[in-house]
Amino acid sequence: MINLALVIFLCTLLNQIVSWVGKSVLQEIAFTAYSWVFLSGTAAKQRKLRKQVLEDKAELGRTSSQDEFAKWAKLRRKLDKGLADLEKTNNTLSSSRSSFSKKFSTLLWLMTTGAQFLLSWWFRKQPIFWLPEGWVPYPVAWLLSFPSAPIGSVSSGAWGAICRRVLSTLQEIIQSLLAPSPAATGPVPTGPSSAKNDQPEAKIEALALEHEKLD
């Protein structure tokens, strides 16, 4: 029989991993893998069209519309067709990305939040494990068994909340350990240095005044 406590813990762990890494990062990684398998031909066509359009633009810029009108018109038609094909390919890739994002978000929600809700509701009356008799006061025992598990046991909902709290605490501890310590910076002296810098200027002004008096 599958251990229900372990299943709930793994679902909670998966949810926390998604929160730590970031949904957008996971979605980008998944779409890159999906594109490499299913959209490699379209992506290669996009790169080829983009390269061709750039070459046609450069050649069109070097061609005079007055001196070489026939060649210029031919290049212009070729460039317009290339731009139209490139836009069509870009729209195809954009549509595929949008569709993939919706499906991936739905799948991710079902695997994390949806699975947690389903497990908590489906096994709401089943105790995950029992507490020793008299180990906690009655209000705490009732809270741990909420909503429908027997008093004295830990319900699936309470167990999921405990797992989330423990994982969040571990995350905070790891982040505090990995965080760089702020560098010790001493106070910047301003008064004495400015006073020292002002002394030569004061001496120069006094000497100038004495010379003016002598003159």
Curated annotation (Swiss-Prot):
InterPro entries: Get1, Get1_fungi, Helix_hairpin_bin_sf
Residues in the Cytoplasmic compartment per record: 25-108, 171-215
Subunit: Interacts with GET3.
Pfam families: CHD5
Compartment annotation: Endoplasmic reticulum membrane
GO BP annotations listed: tail-anchored membrane protein insertion into ER membrane
Ranges that cross the membrane: 5-24, 109-129, 154-170
Cellular component terms per the entry's GO annotation: endoplasmic reticulum membrane; GET complex
Recorded coiled-coil stretches: 73-94
Gene from which the chain derives: GET1
Keywords from the UniProt entry: Coiled coil, Endoplasmic reticulum, Membrane, Transmembrane, Transmembrane helix, Transport
Region (Disordered): 182-202
Record protein name field: Protein GET1
Function per UniProt: Required for the post-translational delivery of tail-anchored (TA) proteins to the endoplasmic reticulum. Acts as a membrane receptor for soluble GET3, which recognizes and selectively binds the transmembrane domain of TA proteins in the cytosol.
Gene Ontology molecular function terms on file: protein-membrane adaptor activity
Coiled coil as UniProt keyword: yes
HAMAP family: Get1 (MF_03113)
Family under the similarity heading: Belongs to the WRB/GET1 family.
Bilayer topology term: Multi-pass membrane protein
